Amino acid sequence: MLQIQKITKEYITGDLHQIALNGISLNLRDNEFVAILGPSGSGKTTLLNIIGGLDRYDSGDLIINGISTKRYKDRDWDSYRNHTIGFVFQSYNLIPHQTVLANVELALTISGISKNERRKRAIDALKEVGLGEHLHKRPNQMSGGQMQRVAIARALVNDPDILLADEPTGALDSETSVQVMELLKEVARDRLVVMVT
């Protein structure tokens, strides 16, 4: 499904040249749970951002379902992100004044789906992560683990082929971290999950 071939990424700031990725190659299959481990500053998030189309690689190739991304234009990357990728971030990135349901629905607003269908899909996604009873709460009324579950529901509501999780348990206690990891393993039954930690 996803092939990373000799990907290189360098950040240049003035005279400073920082090589974040140097010839990285990986093959990732459907329905797989992959954890990428490494110390801070080792390029894990850069790799995740390249897989997710949030950042561009300098050389090498990212091959998606047998198709090279070397000639992708901005609209191709936009389509890839909107239809193929779900993102889960350590900081949740929830809108504090919106309900949990509205936060999840937001991921569907540019998809052209009717309001009723958006609501149904958002409710289903929240039920899938065990938050069906918390639809009308706001993020500040929830625990860290619950907010991460909302973020996972939001990432899943578009039914992406790939879920990317950037340190999803970094801000959680150990018991809640285990629960979130179990949820991500469950999610990997139906799609590729790539997590960095």
Predicted features by range, described:
Residues 2-197:
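ABC family nucleotide-binding domain
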